[in-house]
Each structure stands twice: as structure tokens, then as C-alpha cells.
């Protein structure tokens, strides 16, 4: 009888261990999931960084996703050209060729009914003719100074590629997808796996109206990647045309790094759009954002100054920041940085659980 009890106990013990193992595996699976929060003010390049993460995992887009992106490419091209030509009167500009007024009229008619799978060739022709007008190109080059809204930094790329994009069999290539301008509204979650570790990345709408929706929801994230656009030091907000965009980005960064929700959270700062900044700093003085700056007006010194300004915003002297200068559209550069950042996050957060 005692022997039978002993065998029963053994069986019970084995079952108990099996259940414990299963529970532990479920817990381990959750622990192995790294949660990242992508933050930054509007137009900073968050969506592009998220696309780069997807490229890092070699995750292919579905046919349905590509079709959606193609439609968005068409829409962006037409709408952004419409914004450009409508800004001409306020800028005191006229077309080089009066015939372009006809193209504007036809484009306006097309916009009223844009339910097309592909670009209509005549619509593409009108956009192409407008883009070839020197005055339109001049207006595009000066769009930031004139505060013309909703014109992306990569719009020129799509205008230049109109002959390819307007073809009946057009499918967005990797560059199209990466440079495609998309606005994040609300919270977008993307999941993927790198180095046998599952990631959940949350991209949050950057405009002021979006920010109150999320801050209390993400206290358990493993790290925050905060993105600030270097090139915005002489620009103002879309929502408030008196507020400098760099200063607004710094205010948001300050509120995040000093938030009680993220007191112990790693923060990685991407100073993005370095390529645009490098060109702009040659012509536009950084004093527009930082009148106290006394250094040389060159890339190295101004970026170093901006870094110190961001780092000084933290009230926690023990908090470590990882700062990278990035060009989110430069796949090779960003992929190397993301690989380094992801490795750091894995080691920093999962090593604590004894898994690595």
C-alpha cells in the first residue's frame, strides 16, 4: 500500500512539475517579449523608423498592404501638388507658362473623384507638367520657410518618379515604401521577432491632440525610442504657428523622461534628419531656436550643443541616455543603429530575468 502511495505521489509530482513548467514557459514567453515605445513630435520620422525595423526582420509586405500603399502614393502625389499650387498666390508667384492653369483645373477635377486603383495617366501628366515648371520647384524648395503645410520631405522623390509610378502595373518598391509619408493617428502596434526575441513596438501619434491618449498605458515598456528632427530648428508647429518645432520636441522629451511612468525606463534618443540639418545649417542660423548658442555655425558643434540641451532636460542624474544621429531614410545606417539598439535592449532588460 505504501509502495502504491509512493508511485501515486510520483505521478502526481510529475504532473505538478509539468504544469509548473507550462506556466513558467508562458511567463518566460511574456518576459521574452520586449516592448518598445516610439515617441516624438509630429513629422519627426517615427513611421520611417518603424518601417526600417520591419526591413530589419525581412518581413515582406502582403499584396493587400502593397495595394494600400500604392493608393496612398497616388493620393499623396496629387494632394501635395494641390497644396503647392494653392500656396502660389500667397507667395506672390505665378507659373512660368500660363498653360499650367489648365493643369491645375484638371487636377482639381481629378481630386474630387480619386476612387481609382491606379493613377489615371492624364492626371499623372498634369502633375508632371506642373512639377516641371521652375516656379513650382522654387516653391517646393522654399516650402518650410513659407510654412506650406502637409508637404513631405520626400515629395520630390515621388514627383521625379511619376513616369514609373503612373504605370498600370505599378507596385511600390522598397524605397517607395520607406519614403512614403504616412500620418500616425492613435496607437499603431507592430510585432516581429529578432534574435529569437519577440518585439512589440508601439508608434504613437505625435501631434498634441494625440498625446493624452497613451502616456499612462505604457509604464511597462522596456525602452523608449524618442525621435527628434534636427532639421526642425527653424520651423513652427502645424497646430500652433508661433511655437518652434525643436523647442516643442524638447518639451515633449522633458515630459517623457521625467514622467513617473518612465522613471526606470531606458531612453534612446534619435536625432533624426541629420542629412537635412547638415544642409540647412549652412544657410539658416541655429539662433532661431537657441539664441544663447555661441559656438561655430557648423554641423559638429551645433549637433553637440543640441545633444547637451536634450540631456540637460532630465531631472534624474543617474538616468542613462543613448543618443544617435540618424537619417531614417538611410537604410544601411539606420539598420546598423537599430541592430545595436536592439542588442542593447535585449541585454539590458532580459538579462535581469536570467534568460540571457
Swiss-Prot record:
Binding-site residues for GTP, renumbered to this chain = 43, 45-48, 153, 178, 184, 206, 272-273, 275, 328
Q: Which organism is it from?
A: Caenorhabditis elegans
Chain positions covered by the region annotation G2 motif: 176-184
Which InterPro entries would you find in this protein's record? Gprotein_alpha_I, Gprotein_alpha_su, GproteinA_insert, P-loop_NTPase
Q: Which taxonomic lineage does the organism of this UniProt entry have? A: Eukaryota, Metazoa, Ecdysozoa, Nematoda, Chromadorea
Q: Which PROSITE patterns match?
A: G_ALPHA
Q: What does the UniProt function comment say about this protein?
A: Guanine nucleotide-binding proteins (G proteins) are involved as modulators or transducers in various transmembrane signaling systems. Involved in behavioral responses to P.aeruginosa by controlling the expression of daf-7, a member of the TGF-beta family, in ASJ sensory neurons.
Indicate what this protein is called per its UniProt record.
Guanine nucleotide-binding protein alpha-2 subunit
Write out the N-myristoyl glycine lipidation residues: 2
Every G-alpha domain range: 32-356
* Gene assigned in the entry: gpa-2
